[in-house]
UniProtKB/Swiss-Prot annotation:
The gene is psmb1. The 26S proteasome consists of a 20S proteasome core and two 19S regulatory subunits. The 20S proteasome core is a barrel-shaped complex made of 28 subunits that are arranged in four stacked rings. The two outer rings are each formed by seven alpha subunits, and the two inner rings are formed by seven beta subunits. The proteolytic activity is exerted by three beta-subunits psmb5, psmb6 and psmb7. Non-catalytic component of the 20S core proteasome complex involved in the proteolytic degradation of most intracellular proteins. This complex plays numerous essential roles within the cell by associating with different regulatory particles. Associated with two 19S regulatory particles, forms the 26S proteasome and thus participates in the ATP-dependent degradation of ubiquitinated proteins. The keyword Nucleus applies. GO terms for cellular component: cytoplasm; nucleus; proteasome core complex. Belongs to the peptidase T1B family. It holds the Pfam family Proteasome. InterPro entries: Ntn_hydrolases_N, Proteasome_bsu_CS, Proteasome_sua/b, Proteasome_suB-type. This is Proteasome subunit beta type-1. Keywords: Cytoplasm, Nucleus, Proteasome. It comes from Danio rerio. Disruption phenotype: Morphant larvae have a strikingly smaller head compared with controls, a mild degree of edema surrounding the eyes, and a significant decrease in head/body length ratio. The eye size is significantly decreased in the morphants compared with controls. The lineage of its organism: Eukaryota, Metazoa, Chordata, Craniata, Vertebrata. It is found in: Cytoplasm; Nucleus. One of its GO terms (biological process) is proteolysis involved in protein catabolic process.
Length: 237
């Protein structure tokens, strides 16, 4: 029931007076969830992501992987604001085509990482809301992982997780691959089969606890034979 105090003597609704100026806020960003992960081995690299695209408590798509093939030896994983992910990958793909036409060869993983750093830094005052991880092979055929922050700072890692479930995945990777703070443990070289199984296991665990991660897992395995893809189902609730 509407109170009679809201109306004046002429029957029209009174104007409300605010104590200060009214601000019209607009946020150009949205967080669309999702998790990406990359692991580098002796002669291979793995980049994996889930396929859920969500915002708040709404799921926009169950088939939106966040792994993008850039060259035959490089895969980009990015999560954050999906619009910025699409824009950024289109810019990178255009730069790669220009480089190939000019030099008659594909850009290496390290060169792509350096290029991506300059692209992100160029937008530092209005940054892309994207967390990027590059996985691939370096010039010597060894696995390489490069992780970035939104404004272009990057470093080479052996393994890295990013996105909504990164706080859950990174400690598991530290334990199983990095052997952090572990004594009397034999550091066995990571095989491709073990790495793939580990990636599947940690994503299955993350999907149990993170509402923004789920539906399916896309795994891209980069080796000298090329890029092999696998799809693993995750929980869909």
């Amino acid at each position: 029931m509407i109170s009679a105090q809201a109306y004046g003597e002429n029957g029209k609704m009174k104007e409300y007076h605010y104590t200060g100026p009214v601000e019209h806020k607009f946020s150009p960003y949205a967080f669309n969830g999702g998790t990406v992960l990359a692991v580098a081995g002796e002669d291979f690299a793995i980049v994996a992501s889930d396929t859920r695209l969500s915002e708040g408590y709404s799921i926009h798509s169950r088939d939106s992987p966040k792994c993008y093939k850039l060259t035959d030896t490089t895969v980009l994983g990015c999560s954050g604001f999906h619009g910025d992910c699409l824009t950024l990958t289109k810019i990178i793909e255009a730069r790669l085509k220009m480089y190939k036409h000019s030099n008659n060869k594909s850009m290496t993983s390290g060169a792509i990482a350096a290029m991506l750093s300059t692209i992100l830094y160029g937008r530092r005052f209005f940054p892309y809301y994207v967390y990027n991880i590059i996985g691939g092979l370096d010039e010597e055929g060894r696995g390489a992982v490069y992780s970035f922050d939104p404004v272009g700072s990057y470093q080479r890692d052996t393994y890295k997780a990013g996105g909504s479930a990164s706080a859950m995945l990174q400690p598991l990777l530290d334990n199983q691959i990095g052997f952090k703070n572990m004594e009397n443990v034999e550091h066995v070289p990571l095989t491709q089969e073990k790495a793939v199984q580990l990636v599947k296991d940690v994503f299955i665990s993350a999907a149990e606890r993170d509402v923004y991660t789920g539906d399916a897992l896309k795994v891209c395995i980069v080796s000298k034979e090329g890029i092999k893809e696998e799809i693993v189902p995750l929980r869909k609730d």
